């Protein structure tokens, strides 16, 4: 699991980015959030880092 902070999340477009504690930015889509989880800018989160077609992606995101 990787930890990080939500950089931004657009609820209308259902995506955003998380800056990992490793300094890398991860794309997150609403489908990558664990059920019942909502995130907003500044939230501390943990997630599984994966490699998507366009780069790093966060899956199974949950708040800490």
Q: Where is each model-derived feature located?
A:
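Structural detector for short beta-strands of small beta-barrel domains
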Residues: 1-10
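A generic beta-sheet turn/junction motif
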Residues: 10, 21, 51-53
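Short aromatic-glycine-enriched beta-strand elements
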Residues: 13-18
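Beta-strand/loop nucleic-acid-binding surfaces
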Residues: 24-37
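Short nucleic-acid-contacting surface segments enriched for D/E, G, S/T with interspersed K/R
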Residues: 34-46
């Amino acid at each position: 699991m990787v930890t990080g902070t939500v950089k931004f999340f657009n609820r209308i477009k259902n995506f955003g980015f998380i800056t990992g504690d490793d300094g890398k930015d991860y794309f997150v889509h609403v489908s990558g959030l664990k059920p019942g989880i909502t995130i907003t800018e500044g939230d501390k989160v943990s997630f599984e880092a994966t490699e998507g077609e366009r780069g790093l992606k966060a899956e199974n995101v949950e708040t800490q």
